[in-house]
């Protein structure tokens, strides 16, 4: 226990010698119960009287030491929220981060904050993420580490631009670049302030005075330096490739910027491509009188005009079939004959079968342009999952298609512009038509006119959409800047071998995503972001970038911010020596490029700005599962590319927040829960009560965050009930420590009651498990351990046993002080155990501890500190053997008051009897430690059957197996419990049935009153 008091003296429990005054110091190393274990949830004993349970105290009320504390049992309405604000102020929440940074400690813990997007109000997803991080940080800080946690915000990009333009009701073309940037910056700054205020209110400890922002000039400059380092190594290049393209946003998108609509409806068609030149090996199967067509299926008819080839699977089996309805001959995969015939509502007769490799050398005529040749080509991406086993290939509109085109030098012309419209190159019938709308209609009609469409139907499938505009995207070839992932991938995967993933399956997910990613497009055609520092020749397809130009721009950006790219003339963006070589001020042949860096590159280089040392790795990255393909991956790739190491040692991945029934939260469903409403309550407190931040934090810690996390009124109400029970436990502890000073009143462990020593043993084991769970970031297990301990071990078990000793013994009696010594240690361990999760409650308790005279902050007093001498496995078994007998007794009198019965325990001579003698030296006692455990009027311990038995008594039997010295000695002992109604009267002071007459005090109470 270390509440900021001076070190404990020799009388304190933690430094006292082991042993006990009640018997030999050595206990059996292992005791066991055959067929029976102690029930942690003690049976409720109806009518179990205590002096506290009646409003009528009688004439002895003032002699009973009832709990005294100002710690409230409940905080009603806004009291919880108001108390938390008061605690934050009083206990210095805002100064805690700087205080711990100034400590002279050797270890440091760095949690690198993944930047939330600065485009809206704080939501429960933010709460889940930030509170998980805070729990981890507070634990490591209390354990003695100097925590490094700098919050950040992702401030650039399309989502903010989209929101700004939407609020203004204009499109990007009607505003200048600087107008958009200024409004976007203001929007982001406002969102940051809202979010920051909420995070502070949730109790998040962080370096709030030195947050990082991706629009900060110094951050932008460091990002550009990483970009150029990668460019210099040949890892960044410009190329014409197909990328995900958003017509609504008029920019390229990364895969992480896509959302998939599972209910998207596409128009699919079966199209035939007339065989122009048969493959050499199949010439004998075809003749001019029976023309053959290759049959393909596509869900994107608009790409047919851009077709350059048809791909097949070389190792698959194919066939020439004859359609029974039309008599036409078609080539398709053998495995697809039946499903395609069914789809076309016809039958096929197989004319010939052959291997896919036999298709080599064949060509088809384009179904819209007969004189255009589409060769048959082998490809590895062809599957038999859907379609015909033959794939229409448009290199400008597919990643795999592009790969095939690169191998075979096919044209890659793109017929679609930035707005998703057909260009004039597509022909007058298609020009200026939206490819995903009327453009598709026209293409299908054109194919029908040439009689090359066999069937058209709608298909519902998952389709990618722009994550902000929610509209469908397409794949479109354009000149973009890319990161060469192929050259980094092996090193990135190797670096992950030194990284711990929580849960472990997240590693496989991340490596799978890396394997599936062919390249990373890092350029965007927008203005709110960091410019790619490249100058393009005005008339040639050339660009200018070198160390001189980049370093010059980096210095300008560091001093003035990235606005300079749009505000300064090109002549000032180039260093003088380069400017002279590029035509001079009056005849400059280059203009600044119009592309900005992808926001994933923006945030993915945060390690270069935030981690204090360029070689430093963060101890923990903790984000949602969507970041496995987002920030985790971009951070890994940029760090490995420039430093040859992963930026993190541990990666923890959590799920998303959902409504109470597992449904996605949305305004239309009316199930969006605002964290501020959770904390402060809604307009109607009867429907939306104020819970406070700690209940929000408890819900998060308790949830299985590695899957989807549900939230709603019932789970919040359950969390409130949990904390209410915890408050009652804490109130009991605080109330019974009044008048106790650990420095002067603690009882040495060897002199403590057995049950009190047993509780020290339990809390040492509890503390070890709690610490291990925090180390593993298994906060759900922490909560489960806490709930089991304070509800079962404390409230239901220990407190029910020791109330009489606390309330009715003399204030300074060693027996009472023994219990208070245990209570003080329990309180110390318990509060520290939940402090990282419930910081406000921990500080509130700290303010009410009677022997802490100048409370400041529990977080400044360290982690749990237990003593090795508390660990006594033999003692644990001794108590549990007595508890097994106690459970037998209580189970025999359901619904009745245990104090109205006497217990006779009969045990044959042996080890079990000797153990019970340690708890009760005399034959019969109403004040022994054994009787305290039994909660009976009195307990009698015998080695043989009593000479006389009472009619109507209850007899119970059981057997124990006792293991000594690690199992070297094994002894089985049987016992008998006889339950007899007591003939004694209830004492008017302690209410135990131990008095001779109804108006007389029991001997113990008479002695206590007499001493006073």
Swiss-Prot record:
Molecular functions per Gene Ontology: aminoacyl-tRNA deacylase activity; ATP binding; isoleucine-tRNA ligase activity; tRNA binding
Binding positions for ATP per the UniProt entry: 664, 667
Source organism of the structure: Mus musculus
Location relative to the cell: Mitochondrion matrix
Protein name: Isoleucine--tRNA ligase, mitochondrial
Keywords: Acetylation, Aminoacyl-tRNA synthetase, ATP-binding, Ligase, Mitochondrion, Nucleotide-binding, Protein biosynthesis, Transit peptide
Catalytic activity: tRNA(Ile) + L-isoleucine + ATP = L-isoleucyl-tRNA(Ile) + AMP + diphosphate
Enzyme nomenclature, EC number: 6.1.1.5
Entries under CDD domains matching the protein: Anticodon_Ia_Ile_BEm
Span of the annotated motif 'HIGH' region: 116-126
GO BP terms in the entry: isoleucyl-tRNA aminoacylation
């Amino acid at each position: 226990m270390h509440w900021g008091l001076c070190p404990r003296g020799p009388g304190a429990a933690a430094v006292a010698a082991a042993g006990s005054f009640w018997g030999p110091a050595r206990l059996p190393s292992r005791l066991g119960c055959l067929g029976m274990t102690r029930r942690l949830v003690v049976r409720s004993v109806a009518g179990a009287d205590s002096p506290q349970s009646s409003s009528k105290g009688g004439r002895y009320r003032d002699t009973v030491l009832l709990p005294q504390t100002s710690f409230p049992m409940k905080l009603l309405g806004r009291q919880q929220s108001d108390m938390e604000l008061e605690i934050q102020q009083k206990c210095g929440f805002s100064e805690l981060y700087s205080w711990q940074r100034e400590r002279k400690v050797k270890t440091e813990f760095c949690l690198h904050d993944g930047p939330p997007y600065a485009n809206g109000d704080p939501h429960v997803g933010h709460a889940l993420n930030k509170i998980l991080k805070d729990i981890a940080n507070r634990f490591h800080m209390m354990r003695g580490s100097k925590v490094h946690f700098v919050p950040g915000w992702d401030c650039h990009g399309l989502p903010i631009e989209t929101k700004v333009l939407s609020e203004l009701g204009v499109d990007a073309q009607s505003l200048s670049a600087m107008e958009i940037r200024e409004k976007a910056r203001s929007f982001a700054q406002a969102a940051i302030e809202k979010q920051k205020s909420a995070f502070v209110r949730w109790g998040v400890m962080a370096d709030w005075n030195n947050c990082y922002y991706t629009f900060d000039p110094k951050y932008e400059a460091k990002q550009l330096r990483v970009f150029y380092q990668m460019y210099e190594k040949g890892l960044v290049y410009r190329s014409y490739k197909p990328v995900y393209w958003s017509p609504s946003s008029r920019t390229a998108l990364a895969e992480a910027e896509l959302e998939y609509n599972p209910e998207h409806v596409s128009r699919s068609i079966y199209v035939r491509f007339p065989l122009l030149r048969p493959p050499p090996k199949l010439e004998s199967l075809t003749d001019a009188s029976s023309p053959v067509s290759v049959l393909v299926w596509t869900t994107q008819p608009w790409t047919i005009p851009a077709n350059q080839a048809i791909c097949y699977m070389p190792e698959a089996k194919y066939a020439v079939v004859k359609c029974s309805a039309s008599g036409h001959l078609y080539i398709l995969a053998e495995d697809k004959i039946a499903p395609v015939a069914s789809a076309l509502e016809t039958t096929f007769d197989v004319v010939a079968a052959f291997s896919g490799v036999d298709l080599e050398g064949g060509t088809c005529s384009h179904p819209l342009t007969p004189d255009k040749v589409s060769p048959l080509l082998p490809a590895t991406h062809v599957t038999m999952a859907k379609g015909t086993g033959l794939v229409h290939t448009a290199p400008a509109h597919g990643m795999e298609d592009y790969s095939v085109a690169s191998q075979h030098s096919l044209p890659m012309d793109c017929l679609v512009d930035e707005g998703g419209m057909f260009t004039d190159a597509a022909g007058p019938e298609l020009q200026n038509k939206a490819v995903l709308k009327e453009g598709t209609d026209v293409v299908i009609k054109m194919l029908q006119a040439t009689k090359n469409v066999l069937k058209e139907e709608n298909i519902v499938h998952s389709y990618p959409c722009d994550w902000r505009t929610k509209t469908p995207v397409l794949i479109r070839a354009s000149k973009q800047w890319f990161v060469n992932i192929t050259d980094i991938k092996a090193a990135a995967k190797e670096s992950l071998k030194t990284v711990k993933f929580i849960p472990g399956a997240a590693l496989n997910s991340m490596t799978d995503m890396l394997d599936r990613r062919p390249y990373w497009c890092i350029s965007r055609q927008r203005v709110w972001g960091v410019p790619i520092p490249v100058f393009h020749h005005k008339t040639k397809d050339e660009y200018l970038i070198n160390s001189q130009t980049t370093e010059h721009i980096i210095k300008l950006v560091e001093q003035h911010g990235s606005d300079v790219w749009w505000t300064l003339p090109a002549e000032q963006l180039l260093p003088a020596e380069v400017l002279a070589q590029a035509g001079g001020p009056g005849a400059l042949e280059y203009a600044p490029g119009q592309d900005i860096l992808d926001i994933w590159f923006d945030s993915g280089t945060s390690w270069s700005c935030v981690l204090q040392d360029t070689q430093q790795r963060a101890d923990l990255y903790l984000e949602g599962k969507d970041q496995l393909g987002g920030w985790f991956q971009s951070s890994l790739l940029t760090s490995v590319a420039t430093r040859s190491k992963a930026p993190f040692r541990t990666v923890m991945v959590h799920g998303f927040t959902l409504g109470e029934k597992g449904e996605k939260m949305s305004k239309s469903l009316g199930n969006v829960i605002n964290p501020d409403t959770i904390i402060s309550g809604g307009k109607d407190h009867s429907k939306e009560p104020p819970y406070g931040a700690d209940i929000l934090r408890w819900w998060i810690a308790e949830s299985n965050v590695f899957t989807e996390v549900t939230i709603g009124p019932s789970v919040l109400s359950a969390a409130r009930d949990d904390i209410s029970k915890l408050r009652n436990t804490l109130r009991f502890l605080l109330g019974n420590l009044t008048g106790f000073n650990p420095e002067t009143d603690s009882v040495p462990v060897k002199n403590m009651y057995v049950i009190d020593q047993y509780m020290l043993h339990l809390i040492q084991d509890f503390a070890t498990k709690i610490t291990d769970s925090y180390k593993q970031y298994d906060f759900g297990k922490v909560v489960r351990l806490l709930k089991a301990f304070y509800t079962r071990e404390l409230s239901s078990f220990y407190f029910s046993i020791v109330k009489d000793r606390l309330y009715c013994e003399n204030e300074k009696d060693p027996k009472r002080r023994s219990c208070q010594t245990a209570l003080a240690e329990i309180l110390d361990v318990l509060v520290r155990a939940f402090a990282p999760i419930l910081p406000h409650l921990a500080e509130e308790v700290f303010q009410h501890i009677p022997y802490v005279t100048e409370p400041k902050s529990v977080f400044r007093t360290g982690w749990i500190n237990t003593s090795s001498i508390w660990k006594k496995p033999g003692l644990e078994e001794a108590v549990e053997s007595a508890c097994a007998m106690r459970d037998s007794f209580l189970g025999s009198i359901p619904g009745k008051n245990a104090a109205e019965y006497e217990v006779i325990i009969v045990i044959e001579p042996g080890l079990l009897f000797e153990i019970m003698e340690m708890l009760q030296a005399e034959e019969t006692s109403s004040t022994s430690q054994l009787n305290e455990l039994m909660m009976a009027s009195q307990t009698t311990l015998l080695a043989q059957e009593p000479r006389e038995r009472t009619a109507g008594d209850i007899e119970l039997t059981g057997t124990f197996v006792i293991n000594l010295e690690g199992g070297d000695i094994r002894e089985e002992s049987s016992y008998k419990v006889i339950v007899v109604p007591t003939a004694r009267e209830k004492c008017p002071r302690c209410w135990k049935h131990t008095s001779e007459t109804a108006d007389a005090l029991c001997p113990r109470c008479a002695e206590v009153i007499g001493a006073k």
